[in-house]
């Protein structure tokens, strides 16, 4: 099953996550089909906290990808900010 979830990046004490579309059996930071955005939980100043490619997310959801709980919250937040 395809899932949209967060893949951890960044460095120690500075987490950074990529929103990726991957098979649910793959490891968290393993191979993925596509990167559809990023999330920076420790953004400061002019740094962008959340960026999502809404068109690609809509496509992947239409073909059956399931977002993780945290990604679903982030997608809702992103849609609210875009409106």
UniProtKB/Swiss-Prot annotation:
This is Small ribosomal subunit protein bS16. The gene is rpsP. GO terms for biological process: translation. It comes from the Bacteria. NCBIfam families: S16. Gene3D superfamilies: 3.30.1320.10. GO terms for cellular component: cytoplasm; small ribosomal subunit. Belongs to the bacterial ribosomal protein bS16 family. One of its GO terms (molecular function) is structural constituent of ribosome.
């Amino acid at each position: 099953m395809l899932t949209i979830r967060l893949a951890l990046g960044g460095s120690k004490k500075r987490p950074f996550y990529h929103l990726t579309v991957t098979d649910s059996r793959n490891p968290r930071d393993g191979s993925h089909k596509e990167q559809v955005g990023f999330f920076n939980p420790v953004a400061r100043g002019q740094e962008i906290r959340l960026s999502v490619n809404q068109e690609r997310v809509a496509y992947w959801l239409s073909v059956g990808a399931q977002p993780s709980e945290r990604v679903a919250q982030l997608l809702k937040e992103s849609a609210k900010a875009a409106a």
